[in-house]
Amino acid sequence: MKRIISLALIAVIIVGCFTACSSQGYPVAVGDFKFSQGEYAYCLSITKDKDEAVARCKTYAATKKLMNNEGISLSANYKRIVAEETDSVWSLFAGYYENIGVTKQDITSVLTYEYGKKELLDFYYGENGKNKVSDKKITKEFDNSYVGFKAIEASYIKLSDMGESVELSDNEKKKLKNNFTSMAKRINSGEITIDEANEIYNESIGLIVTQSLDTALTKQGDVLYADTFFSQVQKLDKGEAAVIESGNSIYLLQRQEITNDEDGYVFMYKSEILEKLKMSAVQKKLDNISANLEVKINKGLCKDTEEKQA
């Protein structure tokens, strides 16, 4: 009888140990790299798709493996950015992430993988990279990707005597457009500058200009402007002025040169342009590595994580 009880007790202990060990397992393992429930949950919260979340884990494992192979680690600058982004995300969404089982450290871990890709980009193609992308190529791509301009903006909406927003009449719109068109011609002829045109326009509406216009930059897809705005500005020669209507606004603008070293625009956007040019090459390296890594999925733990976000 005692032997039967002892065997039963041993069985309970074994089952208990197995359950405890399982609950402390990993939902996704890729090669030698294991991803916690919190890390998987954070990936899932971003992708909203379990297959894409697993794909991210594969990329992250490949990122770490490639960094190990090359003997590099995350730079102090990227570590600082990771810490700042983690603090920002946690300050806004801590409650949500705690509810789905994500800790602040989980976010740090995932962001560290993300910036690991940028570290690899710098290692291969950056300023001191193995296959550095020339400054000439960076400048050319920047000039193709962005346009700079100085603009005088006026609205087709005004306040009525009742304090309500109303659209300008057709005659008012025509008068405004003709005024801008006339000044654009004067700019293109060299009679006045865009800043002088700005002074003339503001004086006509009772305002005083105290400083020169700043150069604004935009690219395709910029949500601040209509879809066609970028292409309309890009068609202009540098230094050319034109009138562009966009939504409820009308612009008298002049395209600017933005690749001069003294302005610093190319340097400011260098990382973004390098990523546009070469991140796909880094991703290809990672895909080649991840294709040869064994992926193990704990369906039970994955399901637990997924149900919390359902």
Residue ranges and their predicted role:
Residues 8-15:
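Alpha-helical transmembrane segments
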Residues 23, 31-37, 169, 181-182, ...:
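Cross-family detector of peptidyl-prolyl cis-trans isomerase
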Residues 21-111:
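N-terminal targeting/tethering segments
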Residues 30, 48, 101-175, 224-310:
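PPIase-associated folding chaperone regions across multiple families
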Residues 3, 28-36, 42, 177-184, ...:
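Solvent-exposed loop/turn and edge beta-strand elements of beta-rich ligand-binding domains
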Residues 16-20:
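C-terminal motif of bacterial Sec signal peptides marking the signal peptidase cleavage site
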Residues 1-8:
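Positively charged n-region of N-terminal signal peptides that target proteins for export
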Residues 178-227, 264:
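Peptidyl-prolyl cis-trans isomerase
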